[in-house]
Amino acid sequence: MPKIRKAVIPAAGLGTRLLPATKAIPKEMLPLVNKPTIQYIVEEAVASGIKEILVIVSSKKEAIIDHFDYDFILENALLQKHKDQEHQEIKDIANLAHIYFVRQKHQHGLGDAILHAKSFVGNEDFAVLLGDDVVFGEQPALAQCIQAYEQTDCQVIGVQEVPHDQVNKYGIVTPEANWQKQALVKILGMVEKPAVNEAKSNLAILSRYILKPSIFTALKQVPFGVGGELQLTDGLNYCLQQGEPFFAKHFGGTRFDVGTKNGFIKANLYTALKTDAITKDEVLAILKEFA
């Protein structure tokens, strides 16, 4: 079985949930402490064995491209000021992986963004990571999905349980019977943002996928769906209906939806504590002062 070498990161969204901060700044460049969120996603991919990454961008996203490029003026300035650690950190960003970019000119949904990766992917199975979900843990979430792919030789979707009253915010999988507490379960169906009383489970599709090139054919066959957009979930369902097996991998780790204000704040606090940018006592003191 060939290794998963390539990953696609869609980053063309408008980030409307974080306006006005995202009016001129890509939401993917908003920082968790001192590192933009998309860098955490790229680092997860690299730590999972990915060698080549395609980032799908849109207009006003040049900052993402600049971030993963060399900056010789900045590097020289840091050297002259003997800031060796900062200099190395900046160089390391540009050397993380072979990173390419393509522009999605019109915002027609996640499925449309994935279609822009067809020539990059070729005939290889590949990974997809969405930038809204940052996951921290001992083992990268994507690496867990890749292991499940290697175990099953099937397409894999990363999932976690969400509260039952929030299933209408996610793509939800229909698992086979007796799925509770199983780390890997066969998928019978998928639906994008179902009504709370219609969801077959509370296993939410959460931004990590291992897919086969057949998804490109599927996305050409399905109509625009929820929100008037081309939904990746609909394309996955099409593949499922054609007899392609899928598995849901219940990945471990602490997940934050950094595309929301609440999740972004929580992720920053978590990152600050984990990197010793702030102590627990300092956080409690701040809460005592302002709460």
Swiss-Prot record:
By what name is this protein known? Answer: UTP--glucose-1-phosphate uridylyltransferase
What does the sequence similarity comment in the record state about its family? Belongs to the UDPGP type 2 family.
Key word Magnesium present in the record? no
Query: Does the UniProt entry include the keyword Transferase?
Result: yes
Name the enzyme group at the top EC level. transferase
The organism encoding this protein is Mycoplasma pneumoniae (strain ATCC 29342 / M129 / Subtype 1) (Mycoplasmoides pneumoniae)
Keywords noted in UniProt: Nucleotidyltransferase, Transferase
Q: Which reaction does it catalyse?
A: alpha-D-glucose 1-phosphate + UTP + H(+) = UDP-alpha-D-glucose + diphosphate
Q: What is its EC number?
A: 2.7.7.9
Q: Which GO terms describe its molecular function?
A: UTP:glucose-1-phosphate uridylyltransferase activity
The cross-references to Pfam families, in alphabetical order and at most eight, read:
NTP_transferase
Q: Which GO terms describe its biological process?
A: biosynthetic process; UDP-alpha-D-glucose metabolic process
Functional note: May play a role in stationary phase survival.
**Gene encoding this chain?**
galU
Q: What is the lineage of its organism?
A: Bacteria, Bacillati, Mycoplasmatota, Mycoplasmoidales, Mycoplasmoidaceae
